[in-house]
Amino acid sequence: MKRSKTTNITWIILLWIILILCLIFWLKWNKKSEWDFAIIPHFMLDSEKVDKFYDFLKNEYYNGWEPEKIILISPNHFHTQTKEIQTICKSANVSYNSNTRKLSSELSDLWIKCDKNGEIFESWWDNLKTNEHWIWEHFQRINKYFSWAIIFPIISPCFQLSAVESILTKLKNLNWNILVIASVDFAHYQNEQQTLQHDQKSIETLKSMTLNQSEFIDWIDADCPVCLYLLQSLASQKWKKAELRYRDSSSTILNQDMWAENTSRIFMWYK
């Protein structure tokens, strides 16, 4: 009789554990559709600050949860004549050097042009490889902080704003819990005084939610204004406004004016 009672208690405990785990899983994957946005650089001088920002997103903004999907927007560094936004053609493991992460091709189902010529994602045995360093810089942190999230890459021309309008209508109605990251570095090749002035104008423009295309190009000093314009347009549709978290540069990090070797970084999140 005593053994039977102990067995019953054990089963009750196991049942409660299963119910709690099911509840956690349900809460994790059945939240209402939500869009979140962040601007994170891929210039990795003082990479600890990038980790610090990811940690802020994970533990303060998401409060320990994580998005279901991540759209990672990055400039097309090596094919500057490309005028269209592209994504990956098939879901596959993508390698950068010796590091690998799976990317999803689900955005190509929305008739977003995919990289058929292998300019960005080159066939490599049964997988793909890339020379775009933003892949690994963000992958290793997404693996660490948002390991469950499915990643959708968007590779954008840097200055062809006309590429944005058609993709906006395809993305805006997605019923996902999404974090949209624009992987962008800001002012380059200027002394720190000029860099700071340009960054202040960029920050003001992003905070003001400016969507005038000509003004955006004139006022944003970054390696991919189109990446920022796409993110800004989506954020505006979702009534999210930019907040500055950090701003630094090669000069402030190294505590000396780097002049032509200067690159600035701006970390922003939207609420």
Predicted regions and their residues:
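N-terminal Sec-pathway targeting helices
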Residues: K2-I17
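Short beta-strand micro-motifs in enzyme catalytic cores
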Residues: S264-I266
